[in-house]
Amino acid sequence: MSGLYFEQFFVGQSFNHPWSRTVTEMDNVMYCALTMNVAPIHLDEHYMAGTPFGQRIVAGLYTVGLMIGQSINDTTLGTTVANLAMSDMQFPNPVFHGDTIRTRTKVVSVRESKSRPDAGLVEFEHTGINQHDVVVATCRRTALMQRQPKPA
């Protein structure tokens, strides 16, 4: 377990996660198949050739999932009780096959849980950045995090 406990998070804390991933055509096609997303914007090369993008765009929720996956090892792995909310998803620039995505995370709020004395709420802002240092996605995630165990 390498995640942090509730007490170890503070507002303004930031993480530049060391992992990156080059998104492949197979990633996008499999994600679309698994989620039954048949939008031509993600799957139809000929259709997209006639658009301003000129090529298929990777599904935005795949990118969000990738960002959260890249963030958990040094933030919430093994210490998350539950993810409670995802909000404010934005996709200011497209992700294309072959783009390499890395993630930066900032803690935007930390608060006590009113119903769970053994846990607290942490809100994260995740930012996905491509190989050209261009922001491709942002989202907020609220997680219910374990408190540190009391010494025996």
What are these regions (language model features)?
Residues 1-11, 91, 95-100, 104-152:
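HotDog/MaoC-like acyl-thioester-processing domains
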Residues 1-85, 150-152:
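Hot-dog-fold acyl-thioester-processing enzymes
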